[in-house]
């Protein structure tokens, strides 16, 4: 997987953001999913900033989709920093785009 999006040292992670509420749900919206070859599947999860350990369950994308909510498996508070992580399963290449809220 191309990790050029990563803005940190953690494998397959980037796009750090802080929570602006105490709600234990993160949201991901996949607005672009263009397959260039093969049958890639992109699994995404939210991790505490500075690690790739799952703070939410992972969700696997195979195309565009409306907002998906991922529940945290730990207590969260406003101001805590998290980052989006991803891993590719299946062979091929895809271009993805979207947005997320911790």
Which residues does each PLM region occupy?
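Post-signal peptide N-terminal regions of Sec-secreted extracellular proteins
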Residues: 1-102
């Amino acid at each position: 997987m191309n990790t050029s999006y990563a803005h940190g040292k953690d494998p397959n992670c980037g796009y750090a953001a802080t929570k602006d509420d105490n709600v234990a749900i993160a949201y991901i919206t996949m607005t672009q999913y263009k397959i260039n070859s093969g049958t890639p599947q992109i699994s995404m999860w939210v991790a505490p900033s500075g690690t790739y350990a799952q703070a939410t369950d992972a969700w696997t994308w195979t195309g565009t989709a409306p907002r998906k909510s991922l529940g945290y498996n730990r207590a969260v508070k406003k101001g805590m920093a998290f980052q989006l992580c991803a891993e590719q399963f299946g062979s091929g290449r895809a271009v993805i785009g979207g947005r997320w809220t911790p």
